[in-house]
Amino acid sequence: MYAQAYFDYDSKKSGGVTMSHLRFGKKAIKSTYLIKQANFVACHNPSYVRKYNMVQELVPGGTFLLNCSWSPEELETHLPGQVKRYIAENDIQFYTIDGIKIGKEIGLGGRINTVLQSAFFKLAAIIPEETAIELMKAAAKATYGKKGDKIVQMNYDAIAVSYTHLRAHETDQYL
């Protein structure tokens, strides 16, 4: 498996917008341009769904993951009409996860990186699930090992819990 990553940051050091352009393939990737049509788009900050037109960059049949606490009824209110319409008309697979709630319950506070990373690997299915879990756990151990076993375990918990807290949403009602 080959991967290519390009990250586009705004001028804020913390709390700003980051667009991650990731490519995966069985052959070496030598593309020098940003992704214009994606198979997967995630929005980690629910306020961005009104600010930025993210779903328009999804190919038909692509996957959109929104990190939010909204119920299906609240989604109806919070999602802009053009977002709902694009999702429905283009057969977008739409999922939500409440990363903040998961992080707080596990003890990670507002840190959602492991939660959303786990959700990405589950939904994108670019490598087998068991392999993804093993690799994420190894990365958590390498990244947080010096902070202690408790922090490592909280990240292991985030990996496991994220898989079960993804919510798929029917989108026919958006037509």
Regions found by a protein language model. Give the residues of each.
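Single conserved hydrophobic/aromatic residue that forms the stacking wall/gate
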Residues: 165, 172-175
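Active-site cofactor/cluster-binding pocket
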Residues: 1-167
